[in-house]
Amino acid sequence: MAIVKCKPTSAGRRFVVKVVNQELHKGAPYAPLLEKKSKSGGRNNNGRITTRHIGGGHKQHYRLVDFRRNKDGIPAIVERVEYDPNRTAHIALLKYADGERRYIIAPKGVAAGDQLISGIGAPIKAGNSMPLRNIPVGSTVHGIELKPGKGAQIARSAGASAQLVAREGAYVTLRLRSGEMRKVLAECRATLGEVSNSEHSLRSLGKAGATRWRGVRPTVRGVAMNPVDHPHGGGEGRTSAGRHPVSPWGLQTKGKKTRSNKRTDNMIVRRRK
């Protein structure tokens, strides 16, 4: 994997920094694991905007990724590692011994030809999946379930991982990248290693158009709007907001805690930094 800084042959190329991976599959994705992905433009079924800054962008197919890794005891060969437009991580196409193929989140260091396996007796090796109670303390893991059998929910994006720091009774304690220490049921599954494409954070799109290709529309500042559109709007000439930062609906933003799931508060040993 190489970091390529483009020559400034035009204004749109001047600030482009690419992450080039020659090992990624250059052909089409595996068709039986594709699904149609329609664009909403950020609108709900009434046609009203429920999420701002969404619209346009290149057409995409959704790749059906196996987040459960529940095909136990059957070895699989990594056929190839692919780009996935729906996530920052790469995905790997596995071919199991019984002929079935599945996509998984590609772990760091896993390449075509490697053998992976899931289950209680799986070797301690990057890319293998098993319950947390079978993983040694101190191991780095990703693709962690919060409920047994529900599928991976934590540490799924590029370069993400967590560390298993303790095991006590029916729970294990994980240290997340945010600094949060959290208890998770030991029966939940996780995959060893960290997620691939950790260089994703080093890239620079270089121009506004590259963001538009990804289906993201511009974000207008509140102070640049009229009073009818935003609490920060209006005033003669350039003005400060005149109040603490709020959302377009007047709710406090920038630093206000938004977590509301009190039912699982007792699972958090230490808050994130």
UniProtKB/Swiss-Prot annotation:
Listed GO CC annotations: cytosolic large ribosomal subunit
InterPro entries, sorted: NA-bd_OB-fold, Rib_uL2_dom2, Ribosomal_uL2, Ribosomal_uL2_bac/org-type, Ribosomal_uL2_C, Ribosomal_uL2_CS, Ribosomal_uL2_dom3, Ribosomal_uL2_RNA-bd_dom
First and last residue of the signal peptide: none
Gene3D superfamilies: 2.30.30.30, Nucleic acid-binding proteins, Ribosomal protein L2, domain 3
Pfam families linked: Ribosomal_L2, Ribosomal_L2_C
GO biological process: cytoplasmic translation
Keyword set, alphabetical order: Ribonucleoprotein, Ribosomal protein, RNA-binding, rRNA-binding
Chain intervals for the UniProt region annotation (Disordered): 34-54, 223-273
Annotated GO MF terms: RNA binding; rRNA binding; structural constituent of ribosome; transferase activity
Protein task: One of the primary rRNA binding proteins. Required for association of the 30S and 50S subunits to form the 70S ribosome, for tRNA binding and peptide bond formation. It has been suggested to have peptidyltransferase activity; this is somewhat controversial. Makes several contacts with the 16S rRNA in the 70S ribosome.
Record note on quaternary structure: Part of the 50S ribosomal subunit. Forms a bridge to the 30S subunit in the 70S ribosome.
Family, similarity comment: Belongs to the universal ribosomal protein uL2 family.
Protein's UniProt name: Large ribosomal subunit protein uL2
Organism listed in the record: Pseudomonas aeruginosa (strain ATCC 15692 / DSM 22644 / CIP 104116 / JCM 14847 / LMG 12228 / 1C / PRS 101 / PAO1)
Lineage: Bacteria, Pseudomonadati, Pseudomonadota, Gammaproteobacteria, Pseudomonadales
